[in-house]
């Protein structure tokens, strides 16, 4: 009971403690296994959660919900084929389980099976024609026709929709209107969808706070930070960061196509370590950096490598992609002096528009407003320039447009920077079979092409964004 109360309040760490205590007395209770697994999953401990979900499946093999939970946990670990098998088992037990079918579609998309993903989402809409998650999922995986667009317009006009559904349908409608070449109305749908998303966020974006954070990081790392004394620490790690929708998933897919590199997808071990250190010191990052010793950085580096060991089980190098990682480049290199960092940049207007077209969680609250996006982008570029100046041998500046224009040359330079021999598989990245957990899954299954730019189609709708970027010191081409 105490575990259930703690989980309902969002105190998942306490819930885990409660469920583990009770489970010691009743280890064969599938309900306790399930609740413990769900609490662990909420803490980002998908591997531990999987163990409990597997046991729950053994105890109650005819329960579709436990197979669904297992599929979710496996997917969070990028174990795509296993996730598909678990979700298929859930649907075999209950074919009308909508959420399992949506999750299966997501897994298919992440594995490059776009047609199968679309088929599952269309089946969801056959069962539930107004399902917002299915419509949004389709927007990431297919081109809408006029009939889809008309249906979405009718749905979006309804006044009885929950806020989340209204938001997702707005993004889907915008994509449908783009597919019909009606960018003026697409922008109106985006504006309304983002306003709805912004209003429903639990934590409101604070642009001034973000500016202070970026300034504090620059000021802190402008003073020499003594790194870990182990100069070879982190030689296994290739850290990838950048703004959302800027090409970081593409860069990871290229690197993961190399026979010596494991693509870990988006992982949060570095950020979790920094947060844990901040709690331990009762001091926010980057305030404690000034008093951190070389032994502290060495300890943190060892912890990071221990946490990420699973990604080096079969290959010597791995990618760690995190879209908040650009704040922590200095900390990462203090922990891991031999690591390599790739910061991906894309045309600022294209980047901001791509973010504005996508539904994010509270973490990316800046994406709901073009003014906030401009400020966030300016801060990102300002700190990126700082990292490139401070760590020229350890940080690689990858311009998305340069990669598109001359992929072979840029990929050669990137591999050289990472200390990797050239491999032609990196040029054939779209053929690499692996689970991709981000919304860019379908794009990285295609060869590089120059047709990804969209901002010109929106014309003067983006003039304010351009002005705001220029006012913040961002140079536009």
Kindly give the residue locations of the regions a language model identified:
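Alpha-helical solenoid repeat scaffolds of the TPR/TPR-like class and their adjacent stem/linker regions
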Residues: 1-312
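Short linear Ser/Thr-Pro motifs
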Residues: 86, 246, 354, 439-440
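PAPS-dependent sulfotransferases, especially Golgi type II membrane carbohydrate sulfotransferases
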Residues: 136-139, 149-160, 169-237, 288-292, ...
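Short beta-strand segments
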Residues: 240-242, 253, 265, 318-322, ...
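Short, conserved active-site loop motifs that form the nucleotide-linked donor/cofactor pocket
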Residues: 261, 339, 395
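Conserved nucleotide-binding/hydrolysis micro-motifs of P-loop NTPases
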Residues: 268-270, 348-351, 403-404
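Long C-terminal interaction/binding lobes of large macromolecular proteins
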Residues: 328-329
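Conserved phosphate-donor/acceptor-positioning beta-strand/loop module used by diverse small-molecule
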Residues: 332-354
């Amino acid at each position: 009971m105490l575990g259930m109360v703690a989980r309902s309040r969002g105190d998942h760490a306490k819930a885990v403690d409660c469920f583990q205590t009770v489970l010691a007395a009743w280890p064969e209770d599938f309900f306790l296994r399930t609740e413990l697994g769900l609490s662990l999953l909420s803490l980002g401990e998908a591997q531990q959660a999987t163990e409990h979900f597997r046991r729950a499946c053994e105890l109650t093999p005819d329960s579709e919900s436990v197979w669904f939970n297992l599929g979710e946990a496996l997917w969070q670990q990028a174990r795509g084929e296993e996730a598909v098998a678990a979700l298929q088992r859930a649907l075999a037990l209950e074919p009308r389980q909508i959420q399992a079918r949506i999750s299966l579609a997501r897994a298919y998309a992440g594995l490059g099976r776009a047609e199968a993903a679309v088929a599952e989402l269309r089946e969801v809409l056959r069962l539930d024609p107004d399902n917002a998650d299915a419509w949004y999922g389709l927007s990431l995986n297919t081109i809408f026709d006029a009939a889809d667009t008309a249906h979405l317009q009718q749905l979006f006009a309804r006044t009885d929709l929950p806020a989340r559904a209204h938001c997702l349908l707005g993004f889907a409608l915008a994509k449908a209107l783009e597919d019909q070449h009606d960018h003026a109305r697409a922008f109106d749908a985006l504006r309304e969808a983002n306003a709805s998303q912004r209003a429903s966020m639990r934590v409101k974006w604070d642009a001034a706070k973000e500016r202070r954070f970026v300034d504090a990081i620059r000021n802190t790392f402008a003073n020499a930070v003594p790194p870990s004394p182990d100069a070879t620490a982190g030689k296994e790690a290739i850290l990838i960061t950048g703004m959302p929708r800027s090409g970081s998933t593409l860069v990871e897919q290229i690197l993961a196509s190399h026979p010596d590199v494991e693509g870990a997808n988006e992982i949060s071990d570095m950020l979790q370590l920094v947060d844990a250190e901040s709690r331990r010191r009762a001091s926010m990052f980057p305030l404690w950096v000034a008093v951190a010793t070389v032994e502290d950085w060495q300890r943190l580096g060892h912890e990071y490598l221990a946490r990420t060991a699973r990604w080096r089980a079969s290959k010597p190098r791995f990618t760690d992609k995190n879209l908040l990682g650009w704040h922590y480049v200095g900390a990462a290199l203090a922990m891991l002096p031999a690591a390599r960092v790739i910061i991906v940049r894309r045309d600022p207007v294209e980047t901001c528009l791509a973010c504005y077209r996508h539904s994010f969680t509270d973490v990316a609250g800046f994406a709901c407003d073009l003014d906030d996006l401009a400020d966030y982008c300016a801060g990102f570029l300002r700190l990126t320039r700082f990292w490139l100046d401070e760590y020229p041998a350890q940080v690689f500046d990858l311009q998305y447009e340069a990669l598109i224009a001359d992929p072979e040359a840029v990929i050669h330079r990137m591999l050289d920077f990472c200390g990797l021999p050239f491999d032609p598989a990196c040029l054939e990245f779209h053929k690499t079979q692996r689970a991709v957990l981000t919304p860019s899954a379908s794009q990285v299954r295609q060869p590089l092409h120059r047709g990804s730019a969209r901002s010109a189609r929106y014309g003067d709708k983006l003039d304010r964004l351009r002005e705001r970027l220029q006012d913040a010191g961002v140079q536009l081409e």
